[in-house]
Design a protein with these regions (language model features):
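Histidine-rich, glycine-flanked metal-binding segment
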Residues: 8-55
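His/Asp/Glu-enriched, well-ordered alpha-helical/loop segment
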Residues: 70-71, 77-83, 87-89, 216, ...
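Alpha-helical scaffold segments that flank or form the walls of functional sites
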Residues: 74-124, 168-194
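Active-site gating loops and adjacent loop-to-helix segments of metal-dependent hydrolytic enzymes
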Residues: 69-96, 131, 137, 152-154, ...
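Metal-coordinating catalytic core of metallo-dependent amide/deamination hydrolases
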Residues: 130-232, 236, 300
Length: 382
């Protein structure tokens, strides 16, 4: 299949004004200008998209859809196991329900990839999974599993375990438990090749890919001091760090150059003490200071289908529109460790696209994609 005569977004301020995308077996095989078009590309079928522009399918970098299901209370709440503060062996893939209405809402908004995982009740909460938003069996929707391990600092673990009168009740306790488990996993890993192997430990096993930097360390943090704690722990154990929320990041942006950050939800009330200094300028200031910034909804905290409106708020507060596009494409894939598969339109990546009319503003409340493509198949038409 080939899409031709279409405007193609490649990168910040970089487009092919009249181009083609040739793909087969769900993978992009060739991208180029129409002057380089080969007639044999049409043998598997074609769509003439004159008058349209095409983006990589959008990537929502941090959410919990399918783990807190739409319209349900306890019955659909599967994101926090609040009986043990250290649960790295708990896997989002075993809890996320792809039949949740949020998946189809995301798809209609052009979001083709979501990174889903547990909440922030536990200092080590479990593994995240990157999946496509179209499908019935989650195992067939996987892009990468696990994609990272979730850690949480600050108010949420403190509140959870203070109510149970058990450790951790302080920021000291949270950091100490995280370090203790990471050190256990490190020593466990070192002994696996010994003649006298250690007994199987599910928690340590789950952390081995993290210690080998094969998956990301997603650190939930809002306050500036918690951001610094996340960086400190990541350096101690050589983790591939991504800060999640980083609400006060704009206050310490000079320290965050080169750091991977998922900012959001940008549209939210000041719901608790540690977010009382939240600012809509956060993505702009972090980007200006050379952090790699993505924007998330944290759905269901904010409805996932309005990811584009979150970007619009960031643009209103200083972020360049072209950089805002990166926050839900290239940067989102990079900060989640899946840029080799999604996040841009180039050879050997998955054929996931969001297609709009050429004159439409993709961040407008009045606009949604005309077509959404997953694995090279049109799965939504407006």
């Amino acid at each position: 299949m080939v899409y031709k005569n279409v405007k193609i977004f490649l990168d910040e301020n970089k487009y092919i004004e009249n181009g083609f995308i040739f793909f087969e077996d769900s993978m992009i095989k060739s991208v180029g200008d129409m002057k380089d078009f080969k007639k044999q590309y049409e043998e598997g079928g074609f769509e003439d998209l004159n008058g349209y522009k095409i983006y990589p399918g959008f990537v929502e970098a941090h959410n919990h859809i399918g783990m807190w299901e739409s319209g349900l209370c306890f019955e659909g709440a599967d994101g926090n196991e609040e009986t043990d503060p250290i649960t790295p062996n708990f896997r989002a893939i075993d809890a996320a329900n792809p039949k949740d209405e949020a998946f189809s809402l995301a798809l209609k908004a052009g979001i083709t990839t979501v990174i889903i995982g547990p909440g922030s009740a536990n200092p080590i909460a479990g593994s995240f999974v990157a999946i496509k938003t179209y499908g019935e069996c989650i195992d067939e929707m996987v892009i990468k599993n696990p994609v990272g391990i979730k850690f949480a600092l600050g108010e949420n673990p403190k509140t959870t375990y203070n109510e149970k009168d058990m450790t951790p009740m302080t920021r000291m306790g949270i950091a100490a438990l995280i370090r203790e488990q990471l050190e256990k996993a490190k020593r466990y890993k070192e002994k696996l090749n010994d003649e006298d192997k250690p007994d199987y430990d599910a928690k340590c096993e789950a952390l081995i890919p993290l210690l080998e930097r094969k998956v990301k360390a997603f650190f939930h943090c809002h306050r500036a001091d918690d951001i610094f704690t996340a960086i400190r722990i990541a350096k101690e154990f050589d983790l591939d760090l991504t800060l999640v929320h980083a609400t006060e990041g704009y206050l310490i942006a000079k320290y965050l150059k080169g750091v991977d950050i998922i900012s959001g939800p940008i549209i939210s009330d000041l719901s608790k003490p540690e977010v009382r200094q939240a600012s809509e300028t956060n993505p702009f200031i972090l980007s200006k200071n050379k952090a790699t910034v993505s924007i998330c909804t944290d759905a269901p905290v904010f409805p996932i289908q309005y990811l584009n409106l979150c970007c619009a708020i960031a643009v209103r507060n200083g972020l360049e529109k072209e950089k805002a596009i990166l926050t839900i494409t290239k940067n989102a894939a990079k900060v989640c460790g899946i840029f080799d598969r999604v996040g841009s339109i180039e050879k050997n990546k998955i054929a996931n696209f969001a297609i709009f009319k050429a004159d439409e503003d993709i961040f407008s409340a009045y606009v949604r994609p005309s077509f959404v493509v997953v694995d090279g198949k049109i799965v939504y038409k407006k």
